[in-house]
Amino acid sequence: MRNSMKKWNKSKYSLVMLLLAVMLATSGCTSIVKEGTELLEEGNYTEAAEKFQESVDKGKDLGEAWRGLGICYWEEEDYEKAEKAFGNALQNGSEETATIYNMLGICALMTDKPEKAVYYFENGQEFPDAGQELLKEMSFNLIAAYEQVGDYQKAKEKMEVYLSLYPDDERALKEKEFLNTQVPSREE
């Protein structure tokens, strides 16, 4: 499961684009944050991070600047820094969203903090902005988090719910086979 987490790119792109759209729609941002957002959109993560850091250093638009830094670090796969930046974004007024919680959960998984990942995935699903695709992704990620914690029974329970909603998900069907080797079925 951990290897499959490292290889997901389609969802990663969707998450980043969603956060970028929110950042661009935010009114009242300084030109520094807007410049950083434009650089981020262009894929210039180093330059974008410099702009967001400049805004942080000046104490301007802290929530947006930290969120921008989080996305830059995320794109560079520096999950430790991304997690810290997203946390700072939330502490500085950035809106709590399902997307940020999913990204925080993935950061926690990638940095071997599965208990935190469980928290983020479970709570992130409660936000009203969580669309169907994001809920599906977070549900699957929650299973991965429980596996990493070592709670295979809970992972199996979550997998049963997941497959009742998404019965044709081949990745989940393969994962269920693995979970069945870790936890005997109830009939046994």
Task: Indicate residue ranges for each PLM-predicted region.
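Alpha-helical segment of the N-proximal tetratricopeptide repeat
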Residues: T30-K58, E75
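Start-of-helix register in tetratricopeptide repeats
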Residues: T30-S31, E64, A98-T99, E133, ...
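Register position in tetratricopeptide repeats
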Residues: E41-E42, E75, M110, A144, ...
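Short coil turns that delineate tetratricopeptide repeat
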Residues: K60, S94-E95, D129, P167
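Canonical tetratricopeptide repeat
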Residues: G68-I71, N102-M103, E137, N141, ...
